């Protein structure tokens, strides 16, 4: 998993509340267990017309936001079913940070397992960031995970809170497998001691 230390990029505004995982990645795209290629299905029902052509009114289809790395979204983002394809689709599109006032718990935790930083802010700060994100190609935000700070295009900054363990994992690019490997030496030492003291179990 790639480390997340500092991210600077275009932020796309999506001022819609209760965006569920079916909206993030419709069920038609859930037939694969591969993490790649799902970006094309991200927000598919909103991004594409019935004939498969792009909907020019959807934010991620607008030229300024096609390469967005940050998503500023309405309250209760990621609600609904627990499909892990939702963060996979965001990541495959290129989005590594989602900012909202709240997230569904399962989606929130799945983000950290896949190298995405979900940030919770107050409604007041979300309104400001949504305004910043509405500047098109000038909607550049910098998310500094080391200092827990978001800097806007005008230089103003917003602090955010994050569980220290989750912060550690993102800063070091550790998913569940990475965490286990990080403890590899301690696991080996335990196995040796356990085998010596309980030879019948070896």
Curated annotation (Swiss-Prot):
* Main function: Catalyzes the isomerization between 2-isopropylmalate and 3-isopropylmalate, via the formation of 2-isopropylmaleate.
Per UniProt, what is the name of the gene that codes for the protein in this document?
leuD
Q: How does it assemble?
A: Heterodimer of LeuC and LeuD.
Record the organism.
Rhizobium etli (strain ATCC 51251 / DSM 11541 / JCM 21823 / NBRC 15573 / CFN 42)
Family per similarity comment: Belongs to the LeuD family. LeuD type 1 subfamily.
Spell out the GO cellular component terms annotated for this protein, sorted alphabetically and separated by semicolons.
Answer: 3-isopropylmalate dehydratase complex
- Is Amino-acid biosynthesis set as a keyword in this record? yes
Q: What InterPro entries would the database entry show? A: 3-IsopropMal_deHydase_ssu (IPR004431), Aconitase/3IPM_dehydase_swvl (IPR015928), AconitaseA/IPMdHydase_ssu_swvl (IPR000573), IPMI_Swivel (IPR033940), LeuD (IPR050075)
Task: Give the EC class as a word.
Answer: lyase
Q: Identify this protein by name.
A: 3-isopropylmalate dehydratase small subunit
For this protein, the record's CDD domains field holds:
IPMI_Swivel
User: Domain of life here?
Assistant: Bacteria
């Amino acid at each position: 998993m790639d480390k997340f230390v500092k991210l600077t990029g275009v932020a796309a505004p999506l001022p819609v509340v209760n965006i569920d995982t079916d909206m993030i990645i419709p069920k038609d795209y859930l037939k694969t267990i591969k993490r790649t290629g799902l970006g094309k299905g991200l927000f598919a029902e909103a991004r594409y017309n019935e004939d498969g052509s792009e909907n020019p009114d959807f934010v991620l289809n607008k030229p300024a936001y096609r390469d967005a790395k940050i998503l500023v979204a309405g309250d209760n983002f990621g609600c609904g079913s627990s499909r892990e394809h939702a963060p996979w689709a965001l990541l495959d599109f290129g989005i590594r940070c989602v900012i909202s006032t709240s997230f569904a718990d399962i989606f929130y935790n799945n983000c950290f397992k896949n190298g995405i930083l979900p940030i919770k802010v107050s409604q007041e700060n979300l309104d400001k960031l949504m305004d910043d994100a509405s500047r098109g190609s000038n909607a550049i935000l910098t998310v500094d995970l080391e200092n827990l700070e978001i800097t806007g295009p005008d230089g103003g900054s917003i602090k955010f809170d994050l569980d220290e363990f989750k912060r550690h994992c993102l800063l070091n690019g550790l998913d569940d497998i990475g965490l286990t490997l990080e403890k590899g030496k301690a696991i080996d030492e335990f196995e040796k001691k356990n085998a010596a003291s309980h030879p019948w179990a070896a």
